[in-house]
Amino acid sequence: MEDLDQSPLVSSSDSPPRPQPAFKYQFVREPEDEEEEEEEEEEDEDEDLEELEVLERKPAAGLSAAPVPTAPAAGAPLMDFGNDFVPPAPRGPLPAAPPVAPERQPSWDPSPVSSTVPAPSPLSAAAVSPSKLPEDDEPPARPPPPPPASVSPQAEPVWTPPAPAPAAPPSTPAAPKRRGSSGSVDETLFALPAASEPVIRSSAENMDLKEQPGNTISAGQEDFPSVLLETAASLPSLSPLSAASFKEHEYLGNLSTVLPTEGTLQENVSEASKEVSEKAKTLLIDRDLTEFSELEYSEMGSSFSVSPKAESAVIVANPREEIIVKNKDEEEKLVSNNILHNQQELPTALTKLVKEDEVVSSEKAKDSFNEKRVAVEAPMREEYADFKPFERVWEVKDSKEDSDMLAAGGKIESNLESKVDKKCFADSLEQTNHEKDSESSNDDTSFPSTPEGIKDRSGAYITCAPFNPAATESIATNIFPLLGDPTSENKTDEKKIEEKKAQIVTEKNTSTKTSNPFLVAAQDSETDYVTTDNLTKVTEEVVANMPEGLTPDLVQEACESELNEVTGTKIAYETKMDLVQTSEVMQESLYPAAQLCPSFEESEATPSPVLPDIVMEAPLNSAVPSAGASVIQPSSSPLEASSVNYESIKHEPENPPPYEEAMSVSLKKVSGIKEEIKEPENINAALQETEAPYISIACDLIKETKLSAEPAPDFSDYSEMAKVEQPVPDHSELVEDSSPDSEPVDLFSDDSIPDVPQKQDETVMLVKESLTETSFESMIEYENKEKLSALPPEGGKPYLESFKLSLDNTKDTLLPDEVSTLSKKEKIPLQMEELSTAVYSNDDLFISKEAQIRETETFSDSSPIEIIDEFPTLISSKTDSFSKLAREYTDLEVSHKSEIANAPDGAGSLPCTELPHDLSLKNIQPKVEEKISFSDDFSKNGSATSKVLLLPPDVSALATQAEIESIVKPKVLVKEAEKKLPSDTEKEDRSPSAIFSAELSKTSVVDLLYWRDIKKTGVVFGASLFLLLSLTVFSIVSVTAYIALALLSVTISFRIYKGVIQAIQKSDEGHPFRAYLESEVAISEELVQKYSNSALGHVNCTIKELRRLFLVDDLVDSLKFAVLMWVFTYVGALFNGLTLLILALISLFSVPVIYERHQAQIDHYLGLANKNVKDAMAKIQAKIPGLKRKAE
């Protein structure tokens, strides 16, 4: 596998990388790799389902066992990527194709993955293949999948990247490298090849990082920086994916390097950040560039730590994940060793890395999945002890990875290695370099497009804490205390902020150019924001995915999004938020480290305007994650974290000035976006309130935001979005109470949460991709989503509606997202690949959005249907969540919202949701959870889901159920109301004329004909018969006159009689017919129209039939009609019309009653008569050939 990776990587990372993009999913691969890629595609589908299972089992065994195998796997890929720039090159070529078909990755992902780790489609492969590529890279470290190593490992990486992200923190360089090999995170970062210059910058910055001590994690990692430079030069030629994957490897490799050289990185990153922001702005023009910048940031994070490997990993979209995983394994070893030397926390990270490597070795068999999960959980939980939120996220990540692993089989094993390596790498990164940890985590998370990518996002979620340089460092300190000394981590917060700024800039530059055009385009729309994000946190690949760099607020939001996205890929503020939240929950429950990240997010989110509720929830969620209620925390933290995170950045003593500055810029740019980011800030604040370390992280984030604010006109816009988002957190609690996000909390509790998060992540990625494609339009769309998320307090409907608008642009993308999410659960590689493509093209944006979504879980209302379905689904179970997301997706489709829930119950997300719809999502987030046109019921569902999100884990589950019931009830009530409306109309019709018509209703007619009321029926029958008989004797004129005289005689007589009586009695009763005179007798228009329309229909039908008969349309029918008329001539001779009417009247009032009383006998004789008639007709037809033929 390494050879395959190296040969293609060499071609793509040196100079072929640019030619490779011409391949567009056609990557130079050995036949074996192509077969493996096909198998990988199939395994990815399996992984989608298995990923959830593996994630569940992975936290315990996976963490402990995976690290060891991961290290070998990482080592091999690391050597490929680190020692030889060649391995990254193949990945570069593979990513080259992804820029064009990032979303098509499902189609080509199999072949690229099989032929080479970088073979999978750059962007699609990046998402789908991330898991696959890690497998390719992993094969050396994973003996079990050797035959299908390239295929099964490649598929596995989908799981692995997430796992490595959580487990990798201890050995950050190794895990990132593996991630680089898998291309899970960095694949997405490099999926966009549009930004050629940024790639070069990233390579230069990578050189700086390489020069820095951290870069010497190992020979492989040292090579990565140089490889990154080579890749930076050649990546532009390479496909964006190739560059992205290679950057991932570089980032993973350099991650350790950056750890020791945080100061240098900070300076470099700061400069690179400015360049990136400028280039991001420039890229904003280019859609591809925007997408690329998304990848670019996450890739930057990876390229700083393991630039060459990151690039090689990114080289292939799907293969990229495998490559990244492989690199991670290699890097895990290198990083673990280097981290041990580089930082005090390194021993812890190394220990975790060793655990994960061991787990990976054991996981080489499917049993290893459980072990890895356990192993990962152990290290993660250690991390969790210090950083509960991250631990939860890591757990979720492991669950996702485990599920993916189970689905992929051999691939899963490889993926587990990748996951474990990534996790180990993330752990060591977190321990050694929080900033790099964040970058590696985010990079790993960057690939959540695939299950692996989602897992990586769990890692990213963990790194999410380091999202902002200072905040990231603080988060790393908080998150990595488990991995290492919290004090040292806290100390590194500022350094991380600086380094991350530099890394983000460098990574953004490198990744933007290296990434696929998709990501480049996405970055163009979100370049500034991404640049700020990258500056803040190179590892925060999610940051790049967030807005393009609108303002510090946006950066902060992106950081939060990265945290959320690491946990679960939820880029769309609403749909994606839910997805992020779901994935976050998954990762939290499955990965202790992942859980730590949600907790961190919550703690940061504590200060949000929604701070009281969010803080309440965030602490609860923080405690819950440790207690296993991480599900609630993610749901609460995504929304809360989004708003609180930004608010905390805003409120932090150190951060507020930068944040205010950023907010000022953002307000100038887009007040709406600023509000959106404010909500994440609020979430950050809440998180900060939850934990002092988180507060410090928030401060770091604020600092980072300030740094990122420098390069962000777009950031300003996004920060305005953040401000819009900030009100949302205030509403977001309401929304969480009434929106899918609260449901996601319950869903997070369930193991199914990982599935929904994946869907949500995919959906977010797709939405983000759409945003990336739309560039500023997508930014606006994002703002709309955020604004909508702010609306959720109003019931979540406005949010849903606005999200519908945004989803209208991203409708197709979101649908594929949810479909991808669903496909992950359902083993649908194509959809997953689409999500991967979206993730690769908009990975950074997605991650940032995911962070924002998680930060502003309330924003889940954006895709309430999808998310709602997904979240309830998560609560119920993976299948339930998936069905809910599917149902949610269906609802969205029906609603035209296409929100994320194709079959809320069946497929949910979903959910809904999820989309989703349910998601897609309850409405569904999904959501699913993502037809933008929500039905009113769907909107209601979304609101209910949001409400549930605010609830604690248990409360969220109950609330989700209640919300689902309420969602169902509103529909039923609406139907009932509609039914009642007719009854009300009938009552209205029951004015004198209405009553008359009612009496003439079918019920009244039946009662008359069956003599239910003998008196009434007798009067009607007698009067009608007398009238007809009179007509037989008198002319109609005479009859009319006599009837009128009779009535007048009666009324006049009665009137005179009453007057005489009143005069005698001296009473003042008044006119005897006063009541009738004053009564309403007018016939309503409706009644006239009703009967006239009915009569008109009959008249028209009769006219048409007569025309057909008289014009001999059918000769036989015309002859029959002629015979009938001939018979009537005889009837007319015997009876006149009145006689026939009299006979009809008598029959009408007699036949029904007789038949009712003697039904059995009559039926018997009628049956005999019919039989005789048929027999006679058959004989006649037999004798007359023409008639027989006609009958036939």
Curated annotation (Swiss-Prot):
Q: Where Phosphoserine occurs along the chain?
A: 7, 15, 107, 152, 181-182, 184, 361, 446, 511, 749, 881, 991
Disordered, as annotated region: 1-204, 427-458, 722-762
Q: Which residues lie on this side of the membrane: Lumenal?
A: 1040-1133
Report TM segments.
1019-1039, 1134-1154
Q: Which residues carry this modification: N6-acetyllysine?
A: 1104
Query: What tissue specificity does the UniProt entry give?
Result: Isoform A: is specifically expressed in brain and testis and weakly in heart and skeletal muscle. Isoform B: widely expressed except for the liver. Highly expressed in endothelial cells and vascular smooth muscle cells, including blood vessels and mesenteric arteries. Isoform C: is expressed in brain, skeletal muscle and adipocytes. Isoform D is testis-specific.
Q: Which GO terms describe its biological process?
A: apoptotic process; axonal fasciculation; blastocyst formation; brain development; cardiac epithelial to mesenchymal transition; cell adhesion involved in sprouting angiogenesis; cell migration involved in vasculogenesis; cellular response to hypoxia
Record-listed N-acetylmethionine modification sites:
1
Q: Which GO terms describe its molecular function?
A: cadherin binding; metal ion binding; protein homodimerization activity; RNA binding; ubiquitin protein ligase binding
Give the compositionally biased regions (Low complexity).
Answer: 65-77, 110-132
> Taking every annotated instance into account, which residue ranges of this chain make up the domain Reticulon?
1005-1192
Assembly and oligomerization: Binds to RTN4R. Interacts with ATL1. Interacts with TMEM170A. Interacts with RTN4IP1.
Function per UniProt: Required to induce the formation and stabilization of endoplasmic reticulum (ER) tubules. They regulate membrane morphogenesis in the ER by promoting tubular ER production. They influence nuclear envelope expansion, nuclear pore complex formation and proper localization of inner nuclear membrane proteins. However each isoform have specific functions mainly depending on their tissue expression specificities.
Q: What is this protein called?
A: Reticulon-4
Q: Whose protein is this, by species?
A: Homo sapiens (Human)
Q: Which gene encodes it?
A: RTN4
